[in-house]
């Protein structure tokens, strides 16, 4: 790793930093590497459903986090090791050599176990914001390496735009997409991503697609290209995914699952009212973003 650049004086705080969700317009599994990682092709699309992060400088070098949605929001102890925002902060702290720390406050709006990349987006926004807060800047290739070490989806959220994604998620090509609106439905139940990828009946040999083939849909149903190879397995593991897709069909909408679920989505073309979502399921109308809110950071 190359030497980090001290770019400016540290800031006292940064507030209202967005971390947008993504939808996978399609997700094809094209193979599997000898180390077990799956090879994929997908288009990742940014949407205006965001978590919000706040950062306050700590001069004692400690990294702490609280969830503003939690009843125990004043308890800064027992930070979960799997928390991606904390892991991102610690990784950047180690890579940059800064003696500074941070307290992170998170307003969690993107549902977990949804396939919308909420935790990965939090981590990416954390990396970008903390470079400013701490007054350091890593070379872009080093920042991307940290992002990939945190999770396959994190590098996408550093890229700044919608993207054609290949490999294990590290091969990212920016693309443009037409402005559009979507309805996203998240059922109460989640699904385990490892369980999906370990399923013996997961299709792992979808024919490789091309960006040219995807672009050919530009004047047609671009958001209907391809399919999600994870969806049939996820539907078996989580029946509420099938129920969610049935609900979309009842609204005359053609839906599919995003990522490894359990959220599903469909393009909408007007502001017509939709029926209430079943039970305590989350339903939200969204627009796609043309660029990431932190694209110039």
UniProtKB/Swiss-Prot annotation:
Pathway: Isoprenoid biosynthesis; isopentenyl diphosphate biosynthesis via DXP pathway; isopentenyl diphosphate from 1-deoxy-D-xylulose 5-phosphate: step 3/6. This is 4-diphosphocytidyl-2-C-methyl-D-erythritol kinase. It is an enzyme of class 2 (transferase). GO terms for molecular function: 4-(cytidine 5'-diphospho)-2-C-methyl-D-erythritol kinase activity; ATP binding. The gene is ispE. InterPro entries: GHMP_kinase_C_dom, GHMP_kinase_C_sf, GHMP_kinase_N_dom, IspE, Ribosomal_Su5_D2-typ_SF, Ribsml_uS5_D2-typ_fold_subgr. Catalyzes the phosphorylation of the position 2 hydroxy group of 4-diphosphocytidyl-2C-methyl-D-erythritol. Gene3D superfamilies: 3.30.230.10, GHMP kinase, C-terminal domain (3.30.70.890). It comes from Polaromonas naphthalenivorans (strain CJ2). The active site is at 22, 153.
């Amino acid at each position: 790793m190359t030497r980090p650049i001290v770019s400016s004086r540290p800031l006292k705080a940064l507030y209202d930093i967005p971390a947008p969700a993504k939808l996978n317009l399609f997700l094809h599994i094209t193979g599997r590497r000898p180390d077990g990682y799956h090879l994929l092709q997908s288009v990742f699309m940014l949407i205006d459903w965001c978590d919000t992060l706040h950062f306050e400088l700590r001069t004692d070098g400690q990294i702490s986090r609280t969830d503003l949605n939690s009843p125990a929001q004043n308890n800064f102890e027992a930070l979960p090791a799997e928390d991606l925002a904390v892991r991102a902060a610690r990784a950047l702290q180690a890579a940059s050599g800064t003696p500074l720390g941070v307290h992170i406050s998170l307003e969690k709006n993107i549902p977990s176990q949804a396939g919308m990349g909420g935790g990965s987006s939090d981590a990416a926004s954390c990396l970008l914001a903390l470079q400013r807060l701490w007054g350091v800047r890593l070379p872009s290739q080093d920042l991307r390496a940290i992002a990939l070490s945190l999770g396959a989806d994190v590098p996408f959220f550093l890229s700044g735009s919608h993207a054609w994604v290949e490999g294990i998620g590290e091969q990212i090509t920016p693309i443009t997409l037409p402005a559009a609106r979507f309805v996203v439905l998240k059922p109460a139940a989640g699904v385990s991503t490892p369980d999906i990828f370990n399923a013996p009946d997961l299709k792992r040999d979808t024919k490789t697609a091309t960006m040219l083939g995807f672009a050919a849909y530009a004047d047609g149903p671009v958001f209907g290209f391809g399919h999600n190879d994870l969806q049939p397995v996820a539907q078996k593991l989580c029946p509420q995914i099938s129920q969610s897709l049935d609900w979309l069909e009842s609204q005359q909408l053609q839906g599919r699952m995003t990522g490894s679920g359990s959220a599903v989505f469909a393009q909408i073309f007007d502001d017509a009212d939709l029926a209430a979502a079943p039970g305590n399921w989350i339903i939200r109308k969204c627009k796609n973003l043309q660029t990431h809110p932190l694209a110039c950071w």
